[in-house]
Amino acid sequence: MSKSINLALVGASGVVGSKIISIFEKKNIAINNFYPLGSSSVGNHVIFNDHKYQIEELATFDSSLADIAIFSAGSNVAKEYAESFVNNGTYVIDLSSEFRYEDDVPLVIPEINGNILSELNGPTLIANPNCSVSQLLVAIEPIHRNFKVDILNIATYQAVSGTGKEAVEELTNQIKHDKSDVNVYPKQIAFNVIPQCDIFLENDFTKEEMKVAWELSIIHI
């Protein structure tokens, strides 16, 4: 029988946090104590396995209560709090890009290099790769293993949900109404494709494009 865990979820009320909750429910992963954490959403509630949980304040939470903490609240939050969780004995899985390029932080896709997890010496930070990289490598790795891939020409189409709830709401409003305010993106996003994801860098590539290049060089297949 697998051990039940005490889980903290930072950003529990966000788009990604909500999806994480639904995956844990679907996979029927044994959770002993669940701690939804946030800042602006403190006092709100989330439903997990038919139980109602009140979101607690991240800044004052006793992180030693959690065996594992998943950070899904962006780079700034991860930068401020993630390492303190590790120092208190918690394994931290960070979904942002904050720690992906640190030499001492493993960048893990379980299907590709999950063996790294068995080699960890106690609580540590674990970085989650860019979503495009994860999907790409899961598909490409078995092909590369058997036939060797030399060149990749990659095109990705990013979901509006990746920008957050405000972007989803803006898309919904634009679909429902002929005219709607454009606040999140530089142009109307409904029925449109904008050839830019994240900021442009000095080399004229966007940061999102460079994340793919950087992370492919870190995760060896």
Language-model-derived ranges and their functions:
Residues 172-173, 178-179, 183, 188-191, ...:
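Long, contiguous binding/interaction regions
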